[in-house]
Amino acid sequence: MFDPFLEELLSGIKARGAVPVEVPHGLEHNQSSKRSSTIKSWLWDVPGFRRWRVTRLDAGDSLQVLNSVAYPDYTYDHPLMGVDLLWFGAKQKLVAVLDFQPLVQDKDYLERYFDGLKSLNAQFPDLNGEETMRSFDPNQYFSSWLLFCRGGAEQATSSLPTAFSAFLKTYWDLHDKAVKIPSSINPIEVAQLQKNYDIYSAERDPAHGLFTSHFGSEWSDRFLHEFLFPASQPK
């Protein structure tokens, strides 16, 4: 279901001069021994970004997942980009989260970087995030204008593809504008805020239990701390 979204995302990354980076050994691919599910992950070095990761889980009709997070270079203080798309076939349920994830919730920061996402939020009312996500505090590392829904097959094939394309374009536009203006947060603080994001996310990641059910706790714990949120690893 999400292959067209994956292709569009990777096409945009590659068009920006992305160079593949080696994924930690054993985490780039896994085949479930219990279920007919396969997970593949990619890591990219993209100009202007220190890290861009992508993960695709394919469990046939029962489950489909696409996840991606883009971490800007420390010299830029603009938001991270977060994508989470999940399809639960048995329940015919779509869960979609598309967000520019702010480093801080400061009013000036939000006014500086979120006009584009605000416009998308108004443009796609069925993805306007009015239903609060249960696993995360919307006032920390999530914006008030995220595109979020718990819908069905109709949204997965109608509004979501259009919203996804517009979301990616808007984020690229945000990045292109941000690199031309001085950051309001210094690089050392940006690095710490991105590290805090990893720690916060690793503690609350709702997909960890899902990965564990398919690939076991040992592999999934490694995947969480070594690939998804590597700055969460204790030193």
UniProtKB/Swiss-Prot annotation:
One GO BP on record is: phytochromobilin biosynthetic process
- Which reaction is the catalytic activity of this chain? 15,16-dihydrobiliverdin + oxidized 2[4Fe-4S]-[ferredoxin] = biliverdin IXalpha + reduced 2[4Fe-4S]-[ferredoxin] + 2 H(+)
Q: Which Pfam families match?
A: Fe_bilin_red
Q: What class of enzyme is it?
A: oxidoreductase
Question: What is the E.C. number?
Answer: 1.3.7.2
Q: Which InterPro entries match?
A: DiHydbiliverdin_OxRdtase (IPR023658), Ferredoxin-dep_bilin_Rdtase (IPR009249)
One GO molecular-function annotation for this sequence? Answer: 15,16-dihydrobiliverdin:ferredoxin oxidoreductase activity
Q: Note whether Nucleotide-binding occurs among the keywords.
A: no
Keywords from UniProt, A to Z, are: Oxidoreductase
Establish whether keyword Oxidoreductase is in the entry: yes
List the PANTHER family.
Answer: PHYTOCHROMOBILIN:FERREDOXIN OXIDOREDUCTASE, CHLOROPLASTIC
What role does it play? Catalyzes the two-electron reduction of biliverdin IX-alpha at the C15 methine bridge.
The UniProt similarity line reads: Belongs to the HY2 family.
Q: Could you tell me what this protein is called?
A: 15,16-dihydrobiliverdin:ferredoxin oxidoreductase
Q: Which organism is it from?
A: Synechococcus sp. (strain CC9605)
